[in-house]
Amino acid sequence: MTKTALITGVSSGIGLAQAGIFLENGWRVYGIDQASKPDLVGDFHFLQLDLTGDLSPVFDWCQEVDLLLHTAGALDDYKPHLQVTDEALEQLFAVNFFSVTRLTRPYLEKMVARKSGTIITMCSIASSLAGGGGSAYTASKHALAGFTKQLALDYAKDKVQIFGIAPGAVQTGMTQKDFEPGGLADWVADQTPIGRWTQPEEIAELTFMLASGKLASMQGQIITIDGGWSLK
């Protein structure tokens, strides 16, 4: 039977790489993004949607999944709290946290009913450390990690596997300005123990392993993949 994955943030970066690896391995992939449809080959279905708005079109379009990948996210330009408005804070939480809680509920209910399914959130090293973003980003990713762990505890007996992935510096469209002249790319690579940025395809490979069903005794881990950054 063909397995089905739903991926948010599918049009670029990590989400695009995730879609690619699952399609290559025969999965049916539903992808959501507010950007335009990516060029992917295989059993791919796309919905252009802002995840902070009405989600009912999603549930009509994709009614049941084996795997839910919460990959969409937003950054905050490393702003400290006194430079962050209430509106900006609420918007970042709407993307990074509340879109996850809202999208999870209907699919989780069905996973619990059939005693099967996997949910993976895209956390960050900022889910456990300061300095991986500004105050709004760090707070939203801490909240996401807490939600992930509690969800994993609450639904472990229902055989729903739940994980978080915590990347460090990943070379994506979101971080593209760091690679412009005068950007932070070289400094970040130099400060990373392995000497380079992580690539989206490496996150996708980890995701595929977690979704394989071969790690049945793992539950609730927030798995760091940051080139050794958090060892310092």
For the regions a language model picked out, list residue spans one by one.
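Residue(s) in the substrate-gating loop at a strand-loop-helix junction
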Residues: 124
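Short C-terminal tail/terminal secondary-structure segment
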Residues: 208, 219-232
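Active-site helix of classical SDR
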Residues: 104, 140, 148
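Conserved mid-core segment of classical short-chain dehydrogenase/reductases
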Residues: 75-90, 133-136, 176-180
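Short, small/polar-rich loop/turn modules that mediate ligand/substrate recognition or access, typified
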Residues: 156, 161, 218-220
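N-terminal Rossmann NAD(P)H-binding glycine-rich loop of SDR-like oxidoreductase domains
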Residues: 11, 19
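Catalytic Tyr-X3-Lys loop
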Residues: 82-101, 120, 144, 194
